[in-house]
C-alpha cells in the first residue's frame, strides 16, 4: 500500500508583513489573511524578498581571490618594459577584460558588505542594483537581485587570465598598479598573502614596489648593492651571500620580506634615491605592523629577520625623522631581542675556553670542530643582531640621558668576530665583553667589537653621572663631601677615565688610512674622545669640585696613574679630546656623508659645544667653524646634524663676535 503524501508544515507563498512581525502563522489568503481580518489590521504582502547576506567566510574568500588577481595583474604589467622609475599615475592602462574583472569584483564585494549590514526593513519600491558581468554568458538576468556569484564564476575568469603570460601566485612580486581606495587594498598594503579560508599555505609573496612608486629590477639590485656598500659598514648584521641567495631564489618568509624592505629603505635613505625612501618606509612599517599582529610565538621562535628589520627601521628614523621616533621604534626591537634571548646565545659555552686577559684577543682562534660553518653563521648573525641593538640602546639614550633597556650585567653572548670570518663562513671564537675590556696591548678585534666596548664605557659613564650628579640621591651634602661617597666617586671616576684612555690609545695604533675609510672606526675613536668630555662634565656637575686639594685624592690614584682628579685636569683632557675630534672630522668629506655613522653628528656637536663654551684654546673658534661645516654637509642625510646645527649656529654667533674682537685687539 502506497504511503500517503505528507503535507508540508509551511504553506506555499509569502506570509504577510504583519504576521511576520508578530511571528504568527499566516494562512496566506489574499488580499487579506485571516489573522489581519480578525484583528482588523492592514495586510501587506511583499512578493519580492531581499536576498540574504553572504555566509561566513564568503567575503574573506572573495577578498583573498581578488588580492591574488591583483598580484597577477601587477606581475603582468611589471614584465612589460617600463622606464627606470614609473609612478602609479603614469602606468599604462591594463587590458580591458582584466580591468573589467577587477571592477566587477569591487562592486560585488562592496554590495555584499552593504547587504550584510543592511536592516531587515524592506520596501517594494527599492530597486536593487544588478550584478555587472564580464560576458554575456556570465551576465545576471535582468532585474535579478544581487547575490553571491556562482562559485564557478571566478574559476572561469581565472582560467581566462591564467591563459596569458602570468606566473603562478607562489612566485609573485607584489606591487600595486592602481590606487587602492577600497577595503580590499588592506592585504596589499600590508604586503601579506591573502588569508586562506580553510587551508594554510607556506608560500610567501614579497612586494618590490609601493603604492606610489614601482621599482624596476635594476633599482632593486642597486639598492641591495648600496646597502652593503654604505649601510653595512655601521649595521654589520646581514650575511651577504645568504641574502643574495634568497634574492636569487625569489622565495622569502614574511620576516625575510620585512627585512628586505627595511634594507632597501635604509639604503635609499643613504643614496640619491632618498625620494624613494619615504614610500619604502611607509610600506616597510605597514608590513612590520602586520607581521607583529600575528599570533604570539614561543620565545625561541621569534624570527631573527623580524628583529633585524625593526632595528634597521629605527636607524632609518634616526637618519630621516628624529631621535624620539627612533626611540619608540627601537623599543619594540629591544623587547623582541629580550623575547628571543639573544643576550644568552653563548650561555652554554665554556667560558674557560676563552684566553686570559693578558693574551691577545681570541677572535682569530678557531672554534671546536663540532661547530660547522653554517652553525657559526647562524650564531654569529644572532650575536651581531644583539650587539647592534645593544649599541643603539646606549648611543640613543646618550642623547637625553634616558635609562638603558638592555642591561650589561645579564649578557652571556660573545662579541662579534672579524668581518672576514663572518662573510666567509670561517668559525672563530671571540671573548665575552668583560674579558675584552680587560685586555691590553694592540687590538685585533673587529671595528664593530671596538665600538661595542666604547659604547659600554659610555653607558657606564652615563650611569656614573646619574648616580653622583645629585648628591642628595645618596647622602646629605656634608656626608657626601667627607664620607664614603667621596671616596667611591673618586674610585669610579678614576677607573672610567683610565679605561677610556686605554681604549683610545689602542685605537690610535690603527693606521690613519684605515680609520679614514672605515666609518665604524672613525666613529669609535670620536666616541672615545666624547667619553673623555663626558667625564669632565661629570666632575663639573657634582656639588664639590676642589678635589685636588683633598688628602684622599693621592691615595685613590693607582700607582701608574699620571692624571689628577681635579676638575682643571679633566677640563684640560676634554679640551685635548675636542681637538682630536676636530682632526678626525677632516676625514669626513673624503668618507662621504652617505657612509657616515648615524651617531657621528652627536660626537661632532659635543666637541663644537665644548670648544664654543669652555675651551681655553684660542684656536677653538676655528675648530668650531670646521665642525659646523662638516655638520652642514651631513644635514641632508642625518637628522641629528640638522638638529644640532639649529642650536649651534645661534650659540656660536656671540662667541665668534667675542673671538673676532679679541683677535682684532691683539
Curated annotation (Swiss-Prot):
Q: Which of UniProt's keywords are assigned here? A: DNA-binding, Metal-binding, Nucleus, Transcription, Transcription regulation, Zinc
Q: Which Pfam families does its entry note?
A: Fungal_trans, Zn_clus
This protein's name: Asperfuranone cluster transcription factor afoA
Quote the subcellular location field of this record. Answer: Nucleus
What happens biologically when this protein's gene is inactivated, per the record? Leads to decreased production of asperfuranone.
Question: What is one cellular component GO term in this UniProt entry?
Answer: nucleus
Q: Where is the composition biased (Low complexity)?
A: 353-369
GO annotation, biological process:
DNA-templated transcription; positive regulation of transcription by RNA polymerase II
Described function: Transcription factor that regulates the expression of the gene cluster that mediates the biosynthesis of asperfuranone, a probable antitumor agent.
Extract the DNA-binding region annotation as residue ranges.
16-43
Could you cite one Gene Ontology molecular function of this protein? sequence-specific DNA binding
Protein encoded by which gene = afoA
Induction of this protein: by what? Answer: Expression is positively regulated by the secondary metabolism cross-pathway regulator scpR.
Concerning InterPro entries, the annotation shows:
TF_fung, Transcription_factor_dom_fun, Zn2-C6_fun-type_DNA-bd_sf, Zn2Cys6_DnaBD
- Is the keyword DNA-binding assigned to this protein? yes
For this protein, the parts annotated as crossing the membrane are none
Q: How is the protein put to use in biotechnology?
A: Asperfuranone provides anti-proliferative activity in human non-small cell lung cancer cells.
- List the residue ranges of the region (Disordered): 184-206, 347-373
Amino acid at each position: 500500500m502506497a504511503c500517503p503524501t505528507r503535507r508540508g508544515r509551511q504553506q506555499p507563498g509569502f506570509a504577510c508583513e504583519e504576521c511576520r512581525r508578530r511571528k504568527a502563522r499566516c494562512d496566506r489568503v489574499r488580499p487579506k489573511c485571516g489573522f489581519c481580518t480578525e484583528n482588523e489590521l492592514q495586510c501587506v504582502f511583499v512578493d519580492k524578498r531581499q536576498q540574504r547576506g553572504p555566509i561566513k567566510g564568503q567575503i574573506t574568500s572573495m577578498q583573498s581571490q581578488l588580492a591574488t588577481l591583483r598580484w597577477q595583474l601587477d606581475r603582468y604589467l611589471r614584465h612589460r618594459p617600463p622606464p627606470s622609475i614609473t609612478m602609479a599615475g603614469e602606468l599604462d592602462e591594463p587590458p580591458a577584460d582584466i580591468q573589467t574583472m577587477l571592477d566587477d569584483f569591487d562592486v560585488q564585494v562592496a554590495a555584499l558588505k552593504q547587504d550584510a549590514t543592511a536592516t531587515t526593513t524592506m520596501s517594494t519600491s527599492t530597486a536593487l542594483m544588478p550584478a555587472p558581468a564580464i560576458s554575456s554568458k556570465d551576465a545576471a538576468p535582468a532585474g535579478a537581485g544581487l547575490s553571491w556569484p556562482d562559485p564557478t564564476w571566478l574559476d572561469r575568469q581565472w582560467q581566462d587570465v591564467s591563459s596569458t603570460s602570468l606566473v603562478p601566485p607562489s612566485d609573485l612580486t607584489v606591487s600595486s598598479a592602481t590606487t587602492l581606495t577600497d577595503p580590499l587594498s588592506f592585504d596589499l598594503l600590508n604586503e601579506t598573502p591573502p588569508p586562506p579560508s580553510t587551508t594554510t599555505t607556506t608560500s610567501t609573496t614579497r612586494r618590490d614596489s609601493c603604492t606610489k612608486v614601482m621599482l624596476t629590477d635594476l633599482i632593486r639590485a642597486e639598492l641591495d648593492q648600496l646597502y652593503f656598500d654604505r649601510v653595512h659598514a655601521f649595521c654589520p648584521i646581514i650575511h651577504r651571500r645568504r641574502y643574495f641567495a634568497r634574492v636569487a631564489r625569489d622565495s622569502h618568509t614574511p620576516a625575510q620580506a620585512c627585512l628586505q624592505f627595511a634594507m632597501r629603505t635604509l639604503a635609499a635613505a643613504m643614496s640619491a634615491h632618498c625620494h624613494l625612501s619615504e614610500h619604502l618606509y611607509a610600506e616597510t612599517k605597514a608590513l612590520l605592523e602586520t607581521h607583529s599582529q600575528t599570533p604570539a610565538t614561543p620565545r625561541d621562535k621569534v624570527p631573527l629577520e623580524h628583529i633585524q628589520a625593526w632595528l634597521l627601521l629605527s636607524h632609518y628614523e634616526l637618519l630621516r625623522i628624529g631621535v624620539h621616533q627612533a626611540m619608540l621604534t627601537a623599543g619594540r626591537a629591544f623587547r623582541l631581542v629580550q623575547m628571543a634571548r639573544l643576550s644568552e646565545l653563548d650561555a652554554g659555552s665554556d667560558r674557560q675556553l676563552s684566553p686570559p686577559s693578558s693574551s691577545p684577543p681570541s677572535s682569530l682562534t678557531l672554534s671546536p670542530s663540532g661547530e660547522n660553518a653554517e652553525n657559526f653563521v647562524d650564531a654569529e648573525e644572532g650575536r651581531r643582531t644583539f650587539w647592534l641593538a645593544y649599541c643603539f640602546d646606549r648611543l640613543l639614550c646618550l642623547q637625553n640621558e634616558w635609562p638603558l633597556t638592555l642591561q650589561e650585567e645579564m649578557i652571556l653572548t660573545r662579541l662579534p668576530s672579524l668581518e672576514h670570518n663572518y662573510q666567509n663562513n670561517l668559525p672563530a671564537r671571540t671573548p665575552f665583553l668583560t674579558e675584552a675590556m680587560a685586555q691590553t696591548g694592540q687590538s685585533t678585534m673587529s671595528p664593530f667589537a671596538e665600538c661595542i666596548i666604547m659604547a659600554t664605557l659610555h653607558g657606564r659613564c652615563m650611569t656614573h653621572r646619574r648616580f653622583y650628579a645629585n648628591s642628595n640621591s645618596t647622602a646629605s651634602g656634608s656626608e657626601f663631601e667627607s664620607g664614603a661617597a667621596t671616596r667611591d666617586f673618586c674610585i669610579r671616576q678614576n677607573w672610567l677615565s683610565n679605561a677610556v684612555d686605554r681604549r683610545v690609545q689602542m685605537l690610535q695604533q690603527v693606521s690613519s688610512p684605515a680609520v679614514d675609510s672605515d666609518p665604524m672606526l672613525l666613529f669609535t675613536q670620536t666616541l672615545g674622545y666624547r667619553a673623555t668630555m663626558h667625564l669632565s662634565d661629570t666632575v663639573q656637575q657634582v656639588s664639590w669640585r676642589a678635589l685636588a686639594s683633598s688628602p684622599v685624592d693621592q691615595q685613590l690614584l693607582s700607582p701608574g696613574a699620571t692624571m689628577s682628579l681635579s676638575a682643571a685636569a679633566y677640563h684640560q683632557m676634554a679640551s685635548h679630546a675636542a681637538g682630536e675630534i676636530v682632526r678626525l672630522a677632516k676625514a669626513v668629506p673624503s668618507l662621504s656623508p652617505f657612509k657616515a655613522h648615524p651617531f657621528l653628528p652627536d660626537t661632532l656637536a659635543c666637541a663644537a659645544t665644548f670648544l664654543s663654551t669652555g675651551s681655553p684654546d684660542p684656536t677653538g673658534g676655528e675648530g668650531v667653524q670646521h665642525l659646523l661645516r662638516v655638520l652642514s654637509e651631513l644635514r641632508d642625510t642625518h637628522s641629528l646634524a640638522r638638529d644640532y646645527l639649529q642650536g649651534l649656529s645661534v650659540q656660536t654667533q656671540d662667541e665668534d663676535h667675542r673671538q673676532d674682537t679679541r683677535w682684532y685687539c691683539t
